[in-house]
Amino acid sequence: MDQSTKQTRQQSLPRHVTKTHFVFGPNIRPAMSASRSETIRLDTQDCYQGLITEDPATHLQIQEAKQIPVTGPVYVEGADIGDVLCVHIQNINLSTTGVFAIRPQTGIIGQDIRDQVVKVLPIKSNGLMLNKSISVPLQPVVGVIGVAPKHGEIET
């Protein structure tokens, strides 16, 4: 592949952001600037901030996070305070594993849970694999998305 083809291909790939933080606020330095029509990629983290690995014992070492990590911020060129922004989610690429964690007194059935259970399960094209023959279809969600307030900070 010649140099001009490489440059064209690199220019056509969306720029991406990996920086995370835990508040929306006007004083957080943007991770990137983007035009209104530009396609960008955001590499996000789960609510455990990517700290739970294939070893379920790692969950026992993690204190429940008070905040959810958000990726960015992205400064949208030409956007003014008070503008409504429309974001199109083109695709959600999933990790190769998902975490299933329950513990006593947490969640809707927490009062019925006696022991903490953590499972790190594989994600395949047909869903979350509970075992070799049973998979649960997935419905990916975006999570937290928002804009900075004019004054103050909002925790995630």
Residues covered by each model-derived region:
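A generic structural signal for residues embedded in beta-strands
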Residues: 42, 84-87
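Short, solvent-exposed loop/turn positions at domain surfaces
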Residues: 27-29, 70-73
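Residue-level recognition of short, solvent-exposed, well-ordered loop/turn junctions
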Residues: 35, 77-80
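Intrinsically disordered, low-complexity linker/loop segments enriched in Gly/Pro
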Residues: 91-156
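N-terminal, Lys/Arg-enriched amphipathic/low-complexity engagement segments
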Residues: 2-4, 8-62
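Short, compositionally biased
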Residues: 53-67, 71, 99-111
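Generic recognition of long tandem-repeat/solenoid scaffolds
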Residues: 15-17, 23-25, 75, 119-121, ...
